[in-house]
Amino acid sequence: MALSVHPSIGVARLGNANTDNFVLNPMEIGGLPYEHDVDLKPTTTVVNFKDEAGCIRRQGQVFKVFGASNEELTLDSPNVKNIEWTVHLANKKAAWYEFRELNGNLLYGRDNSYSARGVPWRNASKTASSERQSLIIDLGPRSVSGVMATVEISINNIPETYLHPSYPSGELLQGSKHFESLGTLRTDSQGRLIVLGGYGFAGGNTDLSGYGGGDDWYDDISDGSVTCVVTYSDDSSETSTAWMVVGSPDFAPEIVNISTLSDTCFDVGVRNFDLVPDMYDSATGHYKSDYVANFDRDILPIIQRISQYQWVSNVQSMSGFFSFQFDYRDGSAANKANRMKYYNYFRQLDNKVIGDYDQPQQVLMSSEVEGDILPLMPMNSGSNSVSSSNFYDLTDNVVEKFLALDATQLFLLGQWAEGEFTAGPADDYPVSDMDTASIGNCVGLPMCPGIEMTWSLQNPVIYKDAYQIKHYQDKAYFDVNGLTPERDECEEETGCEPGDLTKRMACPWQADFFNCTIQTVNFSEPSVNKASQTETVTSRTHYEWGNLPAGVSVPDQSSVSATKNVDEKVPLPPAYYSYWWPPQSPWDVLTGELDTEGQLHSHLPAGQQINYARGINSYSQMVEHWSALAFIRDRNQNNDGFPFFTETERNHELFDFKEVLVGQVTGNSEDNETSLPVFFINANKESLEGKGTKKGKLMASYFEERAFSKVRSSNIRPRSGTRMRG
């Protein structure tokens, strides 16, 4: 009997509510998480994402094991004696290289390796092997079996057999003072595994220095191996494996990224593991032109995702891509011109080479001719719209300004345009629904670095098969040797250690989340994203001279009165206002309070478009108050085709509000007939309790009880666009 564990890559999401207050994973792409009963079985979709104190509930991932005939095996199965699950989670962020966009991505060749690019380590002052290993948060593996069992992945129960545990000990000076846990393992009433992640811990000993985070900082994001051993009634046993990733909360779970991590894994599987041999010829490395796509399975999801972006971003020019201005299902030759026009508005993929900037993903508009101008699709920033070709003292930094769909998505869209498609029901691809549902709710593109994981998932060398992460070693090896801080799984090509899939992400995650929504991107110079700026103020004196011979003139005199160097590099104009991952990190949203009390505390009417992160005005505030952000939900979800997405569960009590008259800024009283809304945090106990709500009082108690120190930031260089909020 051949076992398989699903999902093959599970995704949990951290939260700061108490240990037992959690939800279970969505069961479809764009689905809501589930409540559970006393047996830990899913019941209804989530009622509230937060507890009464405004803390976010953790989202657990359910794992199931299946036999050779694809039947689920549980402790109720007649031939099953025991099911034991072992999970080894780790966080390697502090021990990895500094974040430098696409530097280190070996899909661009060995010349783009971390060492070839001269990328420094995080916490570079720690050089000894033992010091580097100590930067990893690694509490060793935990095992759980039976029914309704619970094991915490805590500093207080590290297995004696695990010889090299490590974690930030002592009291940290900023943020969360004490690290305690990477999460929880539980089993339900039939022995299925539920993995819950951390509690939103983020702390350090230095000031935060940018969207990559800071040295000597930690968070409790993690990833690692899942191993299932099924023992049968005759005492024989079989083993199967999977992988687990703990990410940040998904604040708009029903809105799906145009290219998800499931799309990434599908693309890798098609082109490297013969996942759909009728679609791709692995011998020639080309897609098959006679492959027949299916509209409902392959094309409609892209259109639906595009239609949802309007609820979390201002992308009016995308409306033509879901307006059904022609019959998208019509595959006739007469309709081909319409389909081709649609397809040609999607930019093509760059070749992954260093130094070639004359490529499709550097192009914003469809044309330079007035009357034929439309931003190409998708309207997202690319995986490096931040740093120019000469940044980091490099001759040829990789620049990727704007997004393109992945290769397989583009191929299927092209087949639709050519008329090589059917409409209606179609056979499913050979991928488990559980596999697609887990990572299908994660960001697939762009990757700068991403939200949950990054561009290493595009590299086939980390997989043993489609959708299946290759494990580097087993429990016995890690018990003795521990984890390796400097090992690059994409370079060695021998599999992943716990912590490898999330180590390239920002540390702490909140730093990048604060700045990972908007990017203003230059679209005129393919190799340039940003440049330094010198502002020079001159004065000019004009003299009138008389009694001069014909043809003689005296030039005006000028002098420099002030020069100012702008230390921060800024986008070179002309630039375009582009989004990163609005479904995961919303920006332009609708207010949703529908009762008197809610509107009094929100200071806004319902239905007003407003900045999602209003009131979170710094990196340090994001680290401390990330759980105050709203969840975006479809308030009309029972009526398919008529969505109404608004904010819900925002912690309004945390924020104070003032209308600032424009005249206060300009000094001109005539400007005072216009005001600007300003939201800011007031977290003192008196302010929270003074709001007069139960939630405000509980929030005040929560802030008093937690162990947290003020977070500072210095030398901040935010991603362009984030500072100014409309």
From Swiss-Prot:
One of its GO terms (cellular component) is extracellular region. Its cofactor is cysteine tryptophylquinone residue. It is found in: Secreted. The modification Tryptophylquinone is found at W581. This is L-lysine 6-oxidase. It catalyses: L-lysine + O2 + H2O = (S)-2-amino-6-oxohexanoate + H2O2 + NH4(+). Contains 1 cysteine tryptophylquinone per subunit. Induction: Forms part of an operon with lodB. GO terms for molecular function: L-lysine 6-oxidase activity; quinone binding. Keywords: Antibiotic, Antimicrobial, CTQ, Oxidoreductase, Quinone, Secreted, Thioether bond. Its EC number is 1.4.3.20. There is a cross-link at C516-W581 (4'-cysteinyl-tryptophylquinone (Cys-Trp)).
